[in-house]
């Protein structure tokens, strides 16, 4: 995957009876480099530079470490330095609850019934499925509740954290252990995403975030 490029170029033009406008996006999904209106340039910006892709030889910072080193960091970093991760669980849990409270969702309420009508049951797998899919359904429906993202994706952020939260609640693990597992989950997700880039032929939240969550679950279980 090292040769995969995430370079983006999108040009959209709209023509109406009153005129024509064109917008060009380059290098990143939100980076507008040119806007024209009736042939007149109203905005022009340079492309992005300085990424590892542009440099052609620079190694992403996270790839300077091995997976063993990332695991060691997650196990030994002072707990206070990763306490901010707690906010991810709070935010994504609130998103899931918003989905359950909304009449727009269907799958979340189905999974709630499958979990015995409880947000947290004694079934770790059913609880994880509810927390993940409930939050994701709320997100894709556009409910007015934020998701804590990782690598620029809300779905990645949900998958990287909520299975760990389910295990933590069902099995009664200490909170510090949860935070360390989440730190590893995030790092592994970032590690994989630096290989696949912004655009890839596979689903990033299934592969990158899913692998991160799996590593975090192993860490929770003293693996």
Residue map of PLM features:
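Alpha-helical support elements that line or immediately flank enzyme active sites
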Residues: 157-174, 215-222
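C-terminal domain-closing interface element
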Residues: 8-10, 15-21, 209-223
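Signature of multi-pass transmembrane helix bundles
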Residues: 2-142
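A structural-propensity feature for long, helix-poor, extended segments
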Residues: 1, 177-222
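Contiguous domain-boundary segments centered on the initiation and propagation of an alpha-helix
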Residues: 1-13, 170-176, 182-186
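Glycine/charged-rich beta-loop-alpha catalytic/anionic-binding loops adjacent to active sites
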Residues: 138-149, 190-199
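Conserved structured core elements
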Residues: 86, 122, 126, 158, ...
């Amino acid at each position: 995957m090292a040769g995969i490029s995430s370079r983006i170029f999108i040009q959209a033009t709209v023509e109406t009876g009153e005129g024509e406008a064109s917008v060009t996006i380059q290098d990143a999904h939100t980076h507008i480099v040119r806007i024209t209106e009736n042939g007149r340039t109203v905005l022009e910006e340079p492309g992005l530079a300085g990424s590892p892709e542009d440099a052609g030889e620079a190694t992403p910072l996270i790839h300077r470490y091995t997976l063993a080193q990332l695991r060691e960091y997650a196990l030994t970093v002072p707990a206070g330095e990763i306490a901010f991760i707690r906010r991810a669980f709070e935010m994504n849990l609130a998103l899931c609850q918003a989905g359950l409270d909304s009449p727009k969702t269907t799958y979340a309420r189905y999974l709630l019934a499958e979990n015995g009508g409880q947000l947290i049951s004694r079934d770790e797998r059913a609880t994880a499925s509810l927390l993940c899919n409930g939050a994701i359904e709320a997100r894709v429906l556009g409910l007015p509740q934020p998701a804590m993202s990782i690598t620029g994706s809300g779905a990645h952020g949900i998958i990287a954290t909520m299975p760990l939260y389910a295990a933590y609640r069902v099995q009664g693990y200490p909170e510090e252990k949860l935070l360390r597992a989440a730190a590893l989950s995030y790092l592994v997700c970032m590690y994989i995403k630096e290989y696949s880039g912004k655009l890839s032929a596979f689903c990033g939240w299934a592969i990158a975030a899913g692998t991160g969550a799996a590593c975090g679950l192993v860490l929770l279980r003293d693996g």
